Amino acid sequence: MSGATSTGDVGYDELAVLKLLALDGAHRGEVKVSCGDLASRLDASSQTASRRLQALDDADHVTRDLVSDGQWITVTDAGRHALKHEYEDYRRIFEDPGELALAGTVTSGMGEGRHYISLPGYNRQFAEKLGYEPYPGTLNVDLPPDGQRARAGIQALDGVDIDAWEDEDRTYGSATCYACTVVGDGTDFDGAHVIIPDRTHHDDDQLEIIAPVKLRERLGLLDDDEVTIRVEA
């Protein structure tokens, strides 16, 4: 695998090869490829082109049928999915985002949100900067794989900084809040915020949302209910 940073199971160098293959039509069906021709288009050696094709094959991004004068290559569903992710990234760069919508399912948290949100150092800032004191607890939303990648786009939007603070016992970390609307089944609540601590044990597969009301009650939500979170740009 090449490239200092990777997307999915392959590096950016392999994604460049995948893009060339798709431009040749390999995402629709088999195309015939020679390593020499591919190397010329990549401005790389034949060995490098062959190595990148092998990496794509190993990651199940392409299927290959080797013949005497080249190889027949098809981009797989996984390969198309990787290219679609790249496309969505570029859309976020060059288009006005308007808002970022993430779909997920309601889940029960571990109760930590209730404790931290009620702490005076945070609560005071919420009132001053968000204009309300949050209900003591967070709405936790699990995100599917596609939503996890889109979640990274939230931090490119304008947010409200919640500063770190300390008391006699410890220091409490900073966070950023992003205005959002929570959409349930036939009803919604405008005036909530996604809260992302700068340091958190949560993975990218979950969102925490605060609001001046108990969102579960306001929207009639239960665990495993589907919701959409519309984060404002």
From Swiss-Prot:
Substrates-to-products reaction catalysed: riboflavin + CTP = CDP + FMN + H(+)
Binding annotation for CDP: 109-114, 213-216
PANTHER family reported in the protein's UniProt record: RIBOFLAVIN KINASE (PTHR40706:SF1)
Note describing how the cofactor binds: Binds 1 Mg(2+) ion per subunit.
Record GO terms (molecular function): metal ion binding; nucleotide binding; riboflavin kinase activity
Cofactors: Mg(2+)
Enzyme class: transferase
Pathway: Cofactor biosynthesis; FMN biosynthesis; FMN from riboflavin (CTP route): step 1/1
Keyword Flavoprotein appears in the UniProt entry: yes
EC number(s) recorded for this UniProt protein: 2.7.1.161
Gene source species: Halobacterium salinarum (strain ATCC 700922 / JCM 11081 / NRC-1)
Binding residue positions for Mg(2+): 138, 140
Alphabetized SUPFAM superfamilies for the sequence: Riboflavin kinase-like (SSF82114), Winged helix' DNA-binding domain (SSF46785)
Protein family (similarity comment): Belongs to the archaeal riboflavin kinase family.
Biological function: Catalyzes the CTP-dependent phosphorylation of riboflavin (vitamin B2) to form flavin mononucleotide (FMN).
Biological-process GO terms, alphabetical: FMN biosynthetic process; riboflavin biosynthetic process
Keywords of the record: Flavoprotein, FMN, Kinase, Magnesium, Metal-binding, Nucleotide-binding, Transferase
Higher taxonomy: Archaea, Methanobacteriati, Methanobacteriota, Stenosarchaea group, Halobacteria
Any one Pfam family match given in the protein's UniProt record, by short name: CTP-dep_RFKase
Annotated region (Unknown), positions in chain: 1-99
Spans annotated as Riboflavin kinase: 100-233
Positions annotated to bind FMN: 200, 208
Protein name, entry field: Riboflavin kinase
Record's keyword annotation contains Manganese: no
